[in-house]
């Protein structure tokens, strides 16, 4: 019987100074490309793809259980077989036409087997580790029995159905060209792998109808996260339909009427309904939204009311996700959504006023958009390993002079090296006005935990008409079932606070939060030492959507991009992440950036 031993987290790994690059081929770059698009061949609808590995990297590490070698392919991800040898694989979300089952097979490949020593591997390959929930202690997983086995029987290529995202059928293609014989310390590398991806009984009628009715630039047309063949690309329709569902108490709200008029002025086709028409239970609301998806085809939806008026779904914790998974039986949302969480008009009015002022660019000082607050909060084990790389990635890729003020540690960048550092400095910076405030570490229902920024802190702000987009990569800050969670506080605060808040309604995890921010990537030794991954080594993540204009650059796109990054890994928490992250605010708002 296989034994899986879990040990308490290691104090630290002794790491070699630098990973060694093992060159395999100088003729092609590492990655996956489409070489033939035959999806419109009704007798054999298929895509032919080519997977190449130019090189991989090896690095020996040591802990109290012995020496191990890490094997990494830049831009790839872990196979995530916890406790077993951590072999890198290539994952890619691929769009395919509607029809029957999807199959993947290897047509040809160059296979080379050698002793591990020939590849610079002189010890057992490091075991894959489970991602750690942010309120829990790390463990070290080592499956002793797995290291006594020869080659695993895993296929070189597999395909898994993801589901439908707004009319687009998505699958996850996994290519595992590196195979490891742990018992004999042998390695097989399959290079120049030609893959045929086929679709049974392809249904182009359904595919084209879905494209015509639902294709949206807000969702995937501009995203590099999804591999889309030319035969599936279309010009998106005008997708400005906006469904708003409110509690009946707001029928007499002049401010809500003003908000609807404003969104129409921006070009949205707004449909405002109340729960005395739609029903106010999970099931009746879902049935109504499903019907509207077919008839009205909203791109955006806004729930107007708190949990007591428009209840979330309880699935381990409260979530709004399942109101919007209306196409197919999967968990991918088909409508971009947010919530104006309000128990009364006094809580609703500030959210509307701040949204309209922001969209009208009625800024007290437009220079506030040049400022930002990027915070890797404190955790003795994880701040450096996950927080620093995420924040450093954001600085290097996006928050650069001359558009933004120079990034300076202790001024607008905070890489915590101890508990409760820079509390007052962060408050003063946010109070002065920042366009973006990102915190990653520990959170609670009413606060960023360390350095602390609480509901009471929000009350002390005076940042009128200098409202940021706030992203909290941490636990519990979006727990909207309580009276006033941290996310709700930022939106409900009058003449202060934020224009939108993105946060978790339950616990989040260290690895997944990193991927959410920077895109899917291998957790390398460099990352564990606090370095940011190279852009070429990641997919697209929340920063690409927020700052770089992906997904037509709207607030809810941040969540879509972040969760698609997690979707492209082998995390066991893909649905969990779609459930946990929530947007407090208007999902259609386009963030204002200094460089736009």
Q: Which residues are covered by each model-predicted region?
A:
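Sec-dependent N-terminal signal peptides
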Residues: 4-13
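Sec/Tat signal peptide C-region and signal peptidase I cleavage site
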Residues: 15-19
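Cysteine-dependent hydrolase recognition
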Residues: 20-596
